[in-house]
């Protein structure tokens, strides 16, 4: 099969984020307020993440977004993967995700903005309930959380 431009998917937005676990294996999530043009995001939980700026490396963007949304300086330790998603308006997004660790001696200090309402560590059990209730913004968040738990030697998510 020949490949040309018709076989490639045009990505309109690049994003990057981190999965950050505490000493109990709880995941750090941010609750979104929703942004103009995307009211469907309001109240949903997601990993700290955001757009990759022009000329920016996705890993650097993930670190920057984590700090902007949570107040934590983080260090990426493992690339977990990338996935394509589509917003309800049809925009195709490519998101890169890293497992990260916070630099020592910090406390969670989220910078609440017009996009972020809350930031909190969520237990495996509470995550499972949020996911079942449709309160986790993207199903890939569950997959990356499961990968991070395995990587760090924590028990799996409840079924």
From Swiss-Prot:
ATP binds at residues 1-6, 50-51, 87-89. Mg(2+) 1 binds at residues 1, 49, 95. The keyword rRNA-binding does not apply. InterPro entries: Nud_hyd_Dein, Nudix_hydrolase, NUDIX_hydrolase-like_dom_sf, NUDIX_hydrolase_CS, NUDIX_hydrolase_dom. Residues 11-144 form the Nudix hydrolase domain. Its cofactor is Mg(2+). It is an enzyme of class 3 (hydrolase). Mg(2+) 3 binds at residue 14. Keywords: ATP-binding, Hydrolase, Magnesium, Metal-binding, Nucleotide-binding. Its EC number is 3.6.1.61, 3.6.1.69. Mg(2+) 2 binds at residues 53, 65. The keyword ATP-binding applies. Disulfide bonds: none annotated. A motif (Nudix box) lies at residues 50-71. It comes from the Bacteria. GO terms for molecular function: ATP binding; hydrolase activity; metal ion binding. It catalyses: 8-oxo-dGTP + H2O = 8-oxo-dGDP + phosphate + H(+); 8-oxo-GTP + H2O = 8-oxo-GDP + phosphate + H(+); P(1),P(4)-bis(5'-adenosyl) tetraphosphate + H2O = AMP + ATP + 2 H(+). Binds 3 Mg(2+) ions per subunit. Belongs to the Nudix hydrolase family. NCBIfam families: Nud_hyd_Dein. This is Nudix hydrolase DR_1025. It comes from Deinococcus radiodurans (strain ATCC 13939 / DSM 20539 / JCM 16871 / CCUG 27074 / LMG 4051 / NBRC 15346 / NCIMB 9279 / VKM B-1422 / R1).
